[in-house]
């Protein structure tokens, strides 16, 4: 019996060693995929239209909704385009507060245009009929 148990233990050790070798062989293949630095770079976009939903902004206090909506537009443009500076068109700000300072619109369609290196202009997108 003792010989049988030692033989099974040796077989188990061999199989575990083979499994470890297989795992080590697979690790370098996974490491050669995209790195964090490659993921951080955003693709360059010249002109782009997007719809921003202000649901998060509307949830909060009434008196600061306009300010938060403008900040949220900046945040979304920075997030999608990798911009450092975002310029908001006054017409867009007026469209957000069309119903009043406390009752902002639910969503707005904006057109984003690149005007410099990492500088973008966010303006109201007007549908052509």
From Swiss-Prot:
GO terms for cellular component: ribonucleoprotein complex; ribosome. Residues 9-27, 35-46 have a biased composition (Basic and acidic residues). GO terms for biological process: translation. The keyword NAD does not apply. Keywords: Ribonucleoprotein, Ribosomal protein. Gene3D superfamilies: 3.10.440.10. CDD domains: Ribosomal_L31e. InterPro entries: Ribosomal_eL31, Ribosomal_eL31_dom_sf. Residues 1-46 are annotated as: Disordered. Belongs to the eukaryotic ribosomal protein eL31 family. NCBIfam families: PRK01192.1-1. This is Large ribosomal subunit protein eL31. It comes from Sulfolobus acidocaldarius (strain ATCC 33909 / DSM 639 / JCM 8929 / NBRC 15157 / NCIMB 11770).
